Amino acid sequence: MTKRSFPDVNVWFALAVAEHPHHRPALAWWNEESSLAGFSRLTQLGLLRLLTTASAMGGQALTNEEAWRVYGGFLSDSRVRVFPELPALEDLFRRYSGLRQASPKVWVDAYLAAHAAANEAILVSFDQAFKSYGVECRILT
């Protein structure tokens, strides 16, 4: 059985927006993907926020209603699920984010890495930094 995938926000966004600079590598990954791919509440919110942000959308922000339709389009694909916050998530999140210095940019990445690990999923991203968490990653280029 193929391991399921957990794309980060930027992968979902690149898939959703044909004009995105990383749309082609995201689409190439998506077209070859046969396993389940999952959203978390954080990746859902991130996608909805980016789709409705003019600067992220080249001045052409979607309405909230349109953004919901894009998200719904992903969920209508039989490969897409919402992955639950499993009990293991909390301990993993604390371990990945428990640094001895203030590092505000670590919170979201640590959460995404923990969510992928707790759900035994491959974290799919454009960001090489996810490798530092020791979770299984697929870095798109």
Which residue ranges define each predicted feature?
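Residue-level detector of anion-binding/catalytic polar loops
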Residues: 36, 122, 136
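Short, charge-patterned binding micro-sites
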Residues: 50
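Positions that flank functional sites
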Residues: 45, 89-90, 131
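Short, conserved alpha-helical segments within structured domains
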Residues: 43-46, 66, 108
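Short, well-structured N-terminal submotif of metal-dependent ribonuclease cores
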Residues: 1-39, 54-69
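Active-site neighborhoods of divalent-metal-dependent phosphate/nucleic-acid chemistry enzymes
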Residues: 77-124
